[in-house]
C-alpha cells in the first residue's frame, strides 16, 4: 500500500505494471479474439468484467490503461482490415497498449464537429493533419485509432491507425496530473495509406458509437472495485476506534451509514454482473444490453459516489490522510460518472427505452447467468447502436416484481406502488412536448426510470443466486429495495417542486412519496453482515 500511494502522489508512470502485462501476456490473452491469438485468447465478457473490478479495486490509474486499450481496440476488431488485425495481435503479444483518438479539445466527443482531417495525397495515399485531446495511453500506444474526416468529403468519416513512435506523431503533454497518461497529440501531416485505414463513412461513425457502447460498461466495475476496497478500509478503521468510551460502530447513525453503504454496494455488484449476462447473449435480435450498459456506466458509478460519501461520513478526517487507499478513492470515484459520456448524456439515452420497458408486453427470452468461457463476437458486429432503441422489447415488467425473491421482501409492495403511480403519470399526465425538451425535468424522470430498470435486474440476480448474490439474499434484497423506495421518493419530491410540473403531475408525484417498510430485525442482521467484514481484508502495508 505504501509503495502504491507513493507512486500515486509522485505521479510515477507505471512501467513496472506494463512489464507485468507483457511478461504475463495479460492484454494479449484477454483482449485478442481467438481467431487472432493463442489457445487462451478470447474476448470473454465475463472474464473481462471480473478483471475490470479487480483493477479498480487496487488502482484506477492502472485500470485506465486497460480501459482505453479496450476503446482503442474496438474500431480495429470491428474493421475488416485483416493486416492491421494481425499486426494488433502481435503488438498485444509484445505487451502493447492501445489508444482511442476520438475526443478533441474544442469539441469534446462531438463527432460531427471533429477537425482532424485525412487529406488525399495521390492514389491510395493521404496525410493526417490535426490534433486530439484527452487520449489515454497516447504516449506509448502501439496503435492509436484515429477518428477523422476526409477533407474533400466532409461528411465521410474515417478511422485509421497511427503509431506513437512515428516522426510525424507528437505527444505534446499529459493533460492531467496523474499516473495515468491522458495525452494531447498532434499529427503533423502524418502519412497514411489504405493499409492503415480501418473504416469509412457510416461504418466509421457506427464503430465509434459501438465501441463506446460496450466499453463504457467497464466504468461501473471500476466503481465497484473502488467502493469495495474503501468499504474494507472504513470498517477496519471504525470498528477499532473508540470515542467517548464507545466503539464508533456502536453509534446508531454510524450503523445506518454502514447499512446503506453496504446495501448500495451489494446492489452495484449484483446489477453489474447480471447486466454482463445480457451483453454475453447480445445479438441483432436481442439488444437489451443497450439499456443495461449505460445503466452500468451511469447508475452504478453514481451509486459508487453514494457509497463513498456514506463511508466518508463514518471515517471523517481519516479519509484525507495520505497513507490510506480511501484518500485516492475520494478523487477517483468522482471521475467515473464523467467519462465515456456524462451522466446527463447516458441518462437521456436510458429515457429512450422507457416506453418499451414499461408498456411493451411482448414476451422475450429469459437470460441465463453464465461464467463459463465464451467469446462475444457480436460486440464487433453491432452495426448502428442508436437506431430503434424505443422498440427494443424487454418483456412485461410486473412479473419481475412477483418473483420468488421479490415476494419475500416487504419493500417490494411499496416499490411497486411507486412504479404504478409513475406509469399512471406517464399515461394520464404524460410529459408535454415542452417538458420533453426540458433536459432538467427529463433528467429527474430518468432518475426514477433508471431505478426501476436497476431494481429489475437486481431482483433477477437474487432469484438466480450464484456468486454475485449474497448469502441471505432475500434479507439483503429487502434492504436494497428500502433504499430504492427512499430514492424514488426524493426524486418525486424534486419533480413536484419543479415549476414546469403541471398540477396533475404534482399530485401524482406526491403520491409516489412512500415510507419504506422498516424492520429493526433486518437492520440488525444487515449490520451483523457489515461487522463480519472487519479485518476480512487489509492491503499489505
Model-identified regions with their sequence ranges:
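Flavin-dependent oxidoreductase catalytic core characteristic
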Residues: 1-30, 34-57, 62-63, 86, ...
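N-terminal glycine-rich flavin-associated loop
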Residues: 63-83, 108-111
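Short, solvent-exposed loop/turn segments at the edges of secondary structure
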Residues: 70, 95, 111-113, 139-143, ...
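Flexible, small-/acidic-enriched active-site or ligand-binding loops
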Residues: 167-191
Amino acid at each position: 500500500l505504501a509503495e502504491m500511494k507513493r507512486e500515486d502522489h509522485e505521479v510515477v508512470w507505471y512501467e513496472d505494471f506494463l512489464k507485468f502485462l507483457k511478461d504475463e501476456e495479460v492484454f494479449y490473452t484477454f483482449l485478442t479474439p481467438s481467431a487472432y491469438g493463442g489457445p487462451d485468447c478470447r474476448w470473454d465478457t465475463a472474464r473481462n468484467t471480473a478483471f475490470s473490478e479487480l483493477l479498480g479495486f487496487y488502482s484506477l490509474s492502472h485500470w485506465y490503461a486497460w480501459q482505453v486499450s479496450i476503446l482503442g481496440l474496438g474500431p480495429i476488431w470491428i474493421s475488416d482490415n485483416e493486416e492491421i488485425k494481425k499486426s494488433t495481435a502481435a503488438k498485444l503479444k509484445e505487451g502493447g497498449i492501445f489508444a482511442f483518438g476520438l475526443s478533441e479539445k474544442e469539441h469534446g466527443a462531438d463527432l460531427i464537429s471533429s477537425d482532424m482531417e485525412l487529406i488525399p495525397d495521390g492514389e491510395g495515399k493521404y496525410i493526417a493533419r490535426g490534433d486530439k485531446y484527452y487520449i489515454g495511453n497516447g504516449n506509448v500506444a502501439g496503435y492509436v485509432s484515429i477518428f477523422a474526416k476526409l477533407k474533400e468529403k466532409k461528411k465521410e468519416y474515417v478511422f485509421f491507425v497511427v503509431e506513437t513512435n512515428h516522426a510525424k506523431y507528437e505527444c505534446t503533454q499529459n493533460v492531467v496530473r496523474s499516473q495515468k497518461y491522458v495525452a494531447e497529440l498532434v499529427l503533423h501531416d502524418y502519412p497514411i495509406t489504405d493499409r492503415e485505414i480501418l473504416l469509412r463513412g457510416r461504418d466509421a461513425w457506427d464503430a465509434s458509437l459501438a465501441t463506446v457502447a460496450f466499453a463504457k460498461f467497464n466504468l461501473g466495475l471500476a466503481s465497484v472495485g473502488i467502493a469495495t476496497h474503501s468499504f474494507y478500509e472504513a470498517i477496519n478503521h471504525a470498528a477499532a476506534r473508540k470515542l467517548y468510551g464507545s466503539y464508533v460502530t456502536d453509534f446508531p447513525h454510524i450503523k445506518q451509514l454502514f447499512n446503506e453503504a453496504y446495501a448500495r454496494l451489494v446492489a452495484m455488484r449484483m446489477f453489474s454482473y447480471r447486466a454482463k449476462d445480457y451483453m454475453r447473449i447480445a445479438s441483432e435480435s436481442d439488444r437489451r444490453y443497450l439499456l443495461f450498459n449505460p445503466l452500468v456506466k451511469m447508475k452504478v458509478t453514481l451509486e459508487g459516489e453514494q457509497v463513498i460519501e456514506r463511508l466518508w461520513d463514518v471515517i471523517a478526517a481519516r479519509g484525507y490522510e495520505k497513507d490510506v487507499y480511501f484518500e485516492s478513492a475520494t478523487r477517483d470515484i468522482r471521475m467515473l460518472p464523467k467519462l465515456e459520456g456524462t451522466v446527463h448524456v447516458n441518462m437521456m439515452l436510458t429515457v429512450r427505452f422507457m416506453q418499451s420497458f414499461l408498456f411493451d408486453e411482448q414476451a422475450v427470452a429469459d437470460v441465463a447467468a453464465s461464467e463459463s468461457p465464451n467469446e462475444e463476437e457480436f460486440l464487433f458486429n453491432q452495426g448502428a447502436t442508436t437506431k430503434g432503441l424505443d422498440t427494443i422489447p424487454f418483456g412485461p415488467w410486473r412479473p419481475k416484481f412477483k418473483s420468488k425473491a421479490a415476494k419475500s421482501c416487504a419493500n417490494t409492495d411499496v416499490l411497486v406502488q411507486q412504479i404504478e403511480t409513475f406509469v399512471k403519470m406517464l399515461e394520464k399526465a404524460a410529459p408535454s412536448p415542452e417538458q420533453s425538451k426540458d433536459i432538467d425535468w427529463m433528467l429527474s424522470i430518468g432518475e426514477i426510470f433508471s431505478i426501476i430498470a436497476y431494481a429489475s435486474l437486481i431482483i433477477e440476480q437474487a432469484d438466480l443466486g450464484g456468486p454475485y448474490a449474497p448469502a441471505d439474499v432475500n434479507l439483503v434484497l429487502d434492504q436494497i429495495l428500502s433504499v430504492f423506495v427512499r430514492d424514488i421518493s426524493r426524486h418525486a419530491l424534486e419533480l413536484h417542486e419543479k415549476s414546469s410540473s403541471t398540477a396533475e403531475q404534482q399530485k401524482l408525484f406526491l403520491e409516489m412519496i412512500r415510507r419504506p417498510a422498516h424492520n429493526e430485525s433486518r437492520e440488525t442482521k444487515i449490520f451483523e453482515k457489515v461487522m463480519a467484514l472487519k479485518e476480512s481484508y487489509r492491503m499489505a502495508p
